[in-house]
């Protein structure tokens, strides 16, 4: 029996910008709202920067800080008017991650829902990939 072949054609497209279909990091509406609120009080800053540091009982921990500019090797995520910069060292650890902001009666914090994490410590502040 003869096998069928599907024909494929490739066309060059000019004047079209290719955009990634998925950002390294996505933000929930509550994270966007909180970042906007925080930046309102920091007019000299243009966004927040996410980094990763070696610490804790599982090895790595995320850091968040205000930033006045994009670093040379930072990846920029823009969502709903909010700019988040990802340090080079953190870029691979954040692929596919959702950044959320959670507030309850006792605490409020940014939470990184990361599908790549293999393990976390009991308090949830450090992780390994």
UniProtKB/Swiss-Prot annotation:
Where does this protein reside within or beyond the cell?
Mitochondrion
Q: Which gene encodes it?
A: ISCA1
List the NCBIfam families hit by this protein, alphabetically.
iron-sulfur cluster assembly accessory protein
Cellular component terms per the entry's GO annotation: cytoplasm; mitochondrion
Q: Which InterPro entries match?
A: Fe-S_cluster_asmbl/transfer, FeS_biogenesis, FeS_cluster_insertion, FeS_cluster_insertion_CS, HesB-like_dom_sf
In which residues is Fe cation bound? 57, 121, 123
Chief location category: mitochondrion
A Pfam family reported for this protein in Swiss-Prot or TrEMBL: Fe-S_biosyn
Q: Which domain of life is it from?
A: Eukaryota
- List the GO molecular function terms: 2 iron, 2 sulfur cluster binding; metal ion binding
Family named by the database record: Belongs to the HesB/IscA family.
Where along the chain is the transit peptide annotated? 1-12
Keyword tags: Iron, Iron-sulfur, Metal-binding, Mitochondrion, Transit peptide
State the function annotated in the UniProt record. Answer: Involved in the maturation of mitochondrial 4Fe-4S proteins functioning late in the iron-sulfur cluster assembly pathway. Probably involved in the binding of an intermediate of Fe/S cluster assembly.
Its source organism is: Gallus gallus
Query: Does the record's keyword annotation contain Metal-binding?
Result: yes
Query: For this chain's UniProt record, which GO biological process terms are given?
Result: iron-sulfur cluster assembly
Indicate what this protein is called per its UniProt record. Answer: Iron-sulfur cluster assembly 1 homolog, mitochondrial
**Does the record bear Mitochondrion in its keywords?**
yes
